[in-house]
């Protein structure tokens, strides 16, 4: 199995990418990794070249670049070359912690959209109180959506939850302003009607306040709603931990309590860190394309590689393609 990784993408590249890749190579004997980026910088951290090759390029896509224009003009950028490896059959999948917009553009223009899929979806796995996590799609690939798009998201998310996350008959929920039938705007009502007859385990409408309680294994929404929900969850978690830290450091007594509670608090923090689940998969493409978090450390990169490997090994893309072929046009 071969995975191409944009070694220059992310806040801590290339160090985090290289260290994460070496960790993955040590863990999985069937894995070969191509690191795409500046060879001199990559070699500063590469201490084990077993099953790791370097594809050198001096060019990379910056966070300030306009995504689509950058992908079209910077043909030798590390992210574009990683996607090109997939297109040419030299890699089974690719990963980048770089610009989300640019990776989506590279996925569409270089890797290509799967036949039958109208719009791709960006889908992270989010944490839950019980530790199971849930898949949410879309969180920003398309801010405007049609009913057919969300219908296809539900099918793709269900396949992923079952194949990669090992959930039998995963529960699929539609993110809405209430749980009752008939709630929401015209888009929500149309999608609800379609999902009731879909070949999935549809559990109806779900509210954002219940997401972390694990109300569904797959949560479907348009990209605008999903992005707002995602960032609200992120911001709330960060604010709560910040407030808790402030209170625990406010007095000598509370500092003693903090010392006692530290292991439990760290466990809780890790449990709520969605980067531990891997990256956000870009569903609807001809091959797995994974967006790792921009602030990924080596463990986060390793998690993204593990996730990508599972997608390839469990044949997620061929399964989604097969499901879509059986679905009538709506």
Curated annotation (Swiss-Prot):
Native organism is Bacillus cytotoxicus (strain DSM 22905 / CIP 110041 / 391-98 / NVH 391-98)
Using the UniProt record, name the top-level EC class of this enzyme in a single word: transferase
- Name where it's found: Cytoplasm
The catalytic activity, as recorded, is: a fatty acyl-[ACP] + phosphate = an acyl phosphate + holo-[ACP]
Molecular-function annotations in GO: phosphate:acyl-[acyl carrier protein] acyltransferase activity
Gene3D superfamilies tied to this protein? Isopropylmalate Dehydrogenase (3.40.718.10)
| Top-level taxonomic group | Bacteria
**Name of the molecule in the record:** Phosphate acyltransferase
Keyword hit for rRNA processing = no
The protein's role, per its UniProt record? Catalyzes the reversible formation of acyl-phosphate (acyl-PO(4)) from acyl-[acyl-carrier-protein] (acyl-ACP). This enzyme utilizes acyl-ACP as fatty acyl donor, but not acyl-CoA.
User: One GO cellular component from the entry?
Assistant: cytoplasm
- Hey, which pathway is this one from? Lipid metabolism; phospholipid metabolism
What keywords appear on the UniProt entry? Cytoplasm, Lipid biosynthesis, Lipid metabolism, Phospholipid biosynthesis, Phospholipid metabolism, Transferase
Under the heading InterPro entries, the entry gives: FA_synthesis, Phospholipid_synth_PlsX-like
Quaternary organization:
Homodimer. Probably interacts with PlsY.
State whether keyword Cytoplasm applies.
yes
Q: Which Pfam families is this protein grouped with?
A: FA_synthesis (PF02504)
Could you say which EC number(s) this protein's record lists? 2.3.1.274
Q: Which GO terms describe its biological process?
A: fatty acid biosynthetic process; phospholipid biosynthetic process
Q: Corresponding gene? A: plsX
Family affiliation: Belongs to the PlsX family.
């Amino acid at each position: 199995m071969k995975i191409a990784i944009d070694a220059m993408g992310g806040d801590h590249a290339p160090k985090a990418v290289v260290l994460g890749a070496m960790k993955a190579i040590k863990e999985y004997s069937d894995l070969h990794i191509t690191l795409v980026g500046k060879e001199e910088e990559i070699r500063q951290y590469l201490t084990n070249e077993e099953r790791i090759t370097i594809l050198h390029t001096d060019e990379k896509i910056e966070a300030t670049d306009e995504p689509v224009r950058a992908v079209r003009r910077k043909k030798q950028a590390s992210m574009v070359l990683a996607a090109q490896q997939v297109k040419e059959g030299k890699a089974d999948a690719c990963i980048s912690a770089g610009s989300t917009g640019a990776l989506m553009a590279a996925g569409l223009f270089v890797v290509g959209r799967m036949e039958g899929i109208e719009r791709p979806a960006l889908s992270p796995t989010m944490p839950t109180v019980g530790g199971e996590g849930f898949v949410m799609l879309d969180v920003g690939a398309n801010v405007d959506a049609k009913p057919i798009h969300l219908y296809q998201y539900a099918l793709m998310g269900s396949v992923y939850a079952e194949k990669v996350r090992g959930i039998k008959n995963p529960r699929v929920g539609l993110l809405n302003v209430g749980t009752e039938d008939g709630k929401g705007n015209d888009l929500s009502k149309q999608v609800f009607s379609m999902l009731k007859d879909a070949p999935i385990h549809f559990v109806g409408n779900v509210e954002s306040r219940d997401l972390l309680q694990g109300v569904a294994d797959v949560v479907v929404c348009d990209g605008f709603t999903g992005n707002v929900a995602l960032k609200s969850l992120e911001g709330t978690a960060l604010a709560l931990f910040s407030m808790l830290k402030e209170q625990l450091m406010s007095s000598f007594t509370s500092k003693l309590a903090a010392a006692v509670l530290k292991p439990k608090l760290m466990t809780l923090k890790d449990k709520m860190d969605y980067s531990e689940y891997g990256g956000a998969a870009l569903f609807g493409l001809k091959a797995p394309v994974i967006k790792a978090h921009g602030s990924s450390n080596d463990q986060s990169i390793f998690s993204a590689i593990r996730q990508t490997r599972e997608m390839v090994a469990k044949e997620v893309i061929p399964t989604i393609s097969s499901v879509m072929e059986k679905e009538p046009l709506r």
